[in-house]
Amino acid sequence: MTYLEIDGVEKLSGEVIISGAKNAALPLIASSILAKNEAQISNLPNVADICTLLSLLKNLGASYTFENNFAKINTKDLNKTIAKYDIVRKMRASILTLGPLLARFGNCEVSLPGGCAIGQRPIDLHLLALEKMGANIEIKQGYVVASGKLKGADLMFDKITVTGSENIIMAAALAHGKTRLLNVAKEPEVVQLCEVLAEAGLDIKGVGSDELEIYGTSGELLEFKPFKIIPDRIEAGTYLCAGAITNSKITLKNVNANHLGAVLAKLEQMGFSFDISEDSISINPAKEIKPVEILTSEYPGFPTDMQAQFMALALRANGVSIIDERLFENRFMHVSELLRMGADIRLNGHIATINGTKELFGADVMATDLRASSALILAALAAKGTSKIHRIYHLDRGYENLEEKFKNLGASIRRLEE
């Protein structure tokens, strides 16, 4: 097992290039199941979750090449419809193959998913929508077994679901007739999926809103055009927090500030300022790091995937910060590890109260999920002494070239063997 060893630093400086968004790439890779031709994807991050999903497609009969952040995926010879547990267990996003497989073949079996252990994250909403589209759904021995010819339907998600929206959009693409989807997630990653499918010939209206009309092709596969993955707004937010927690000036390249509205607003409230251009953001040091109140919510609200990083940052604030986590239960598992570093944090249900300005000290800590891992890195940068972060396979699922990017900013960070 490998771990990261990080020395606390006074300041960071320099530039970091933001990778393509993993959470945009995953549904788009799954959507290649709907393609009659080769899908060509650029700016694809080389992280573990991407490689896992590509392996799953290969296991189903597809072929692909992937190098220098560019992939070609050919699903013409895809001839299997069982997404097996040994691959799916590695990450929850594998469930995104359910909608397109069922739409294309009329039957499939997809193992119930794995991934980060942050709450239930049920797929009930996916299954209910597919049933309303005419699918027969059973859960057998840990698999979702689905069959049936999909028909357009009027659907409304009881709660906003990103992967649910993506799955049903892909299912509706090849269905017979019109699907009307209400309460759709509006995340930039969902929007890009819709835009790519529209470019491929799908008649889809309302892109970017919470109401979509999708006119299915009755089984006819789509003609994909080459496309480029949007920048990763969560990776960008993480590096902005790295600049903030060390009160440094750093610059992010290949970033879309329009996707970071809530994150930038909270950093401004904490005293930081920015220089923003078309594809770059520079964060400037604060005269004083102020406390902040954060309520996580669906896009365009404050992203739950940035909650842990802001908790680490709030430890440097001059006062008491409040974080109210409304989207997932069990998403404060990083708190016990931050306490080991000297943090003063109190939990009451889904609300965390963070007392800032206390000194942090290097310690041995354990990553519990992807975003919690990045929070521990941020805390280690601001701590006195050396920290060791264990179970970093979580980081490798979602952050590309993390050590190199931090080293380029002046961090003292090493990957070592246990």
From Swiss-Prot:
Residues engaged in binding UDP-N-acetyl-alpha-D-glucosamine: 92, 121-125, 305, 327
* Catalytic residues (UniProt): 116 (proton donor)
Q: Which NCBIfam families match?
A: murA, PRK09369.1
InterPro entries on file? Enolpyruvate_Tfrase_dom, Enolpyruvate_Tfrase_sf, MurA_subfamily, RNA3'P_cycl/enolpyr_Trfase_a/b, UDP_GlcNAc_COvinyl_MurA
UniProt xrefs under CDD domains:
UdpNAET
Keyword Signal set for record:
no
Q: Pfam families, from UniProt?
A: EPSP_synthase
Keywords for this entry?
Answer: Cell cycle, Cell division, Cell shape, Cell wall biogenesis/degradation, Cytoplasm, Peptidoglycan synthesis, Pyruvate, Transferase
- Any one GO CC term of the record: cytoplasm
Coding gene? Answer: murA
* Family, as annotated: Belongs to the EPSP synthase family. MurA subfamily.
Task: Describe the reaction catalysed, as an equation.
Answer: phosphoenolpyruvate + UDP-N-acetyl-alpha-D-glucosamine = UDP-N-acetyl-3-O-(1-carboxyvinyl)-alpha-D-glucosamine + phosphate
One Gene Ontology MF term: UDP-N-acetylglucosamine 1-carboxyvinyltransferase activity
Say which species the protein is native to.
Campylobacter lari (strain RM2100 / D67 / ATCC BAA-1060)
Q: Which domain of life is it from?
A: Bacteria
**Organism ancestry:** Bacteria, Pseudomonadati, Campylobacterota, Epsilonproteobacteria, Campylobacterales
**Which EC numbers does the record give?**
2.5.1.7
Q: Which GO terms describe its biological process?
A: cell division; cell wall organization; peptidoglycan biosynthetic process; regulation of cell shape; UDP-N-acetylgalactosamine biosynthetic process
Name the UniProt record assigns to this protein: UDP-N-acetylglucosamine 1-carboxyvinyltransferase
The record's annotation in HAMAP family points to: MurA (MF_00111)
Function, as annotated:
Cell wall formation. Adds enolpyruvyl to UDP-N-acetylglucosamine.
Principal location class: cytoplasm
Residues that coordinate or bind phosphoenolpyruvate? 22-23
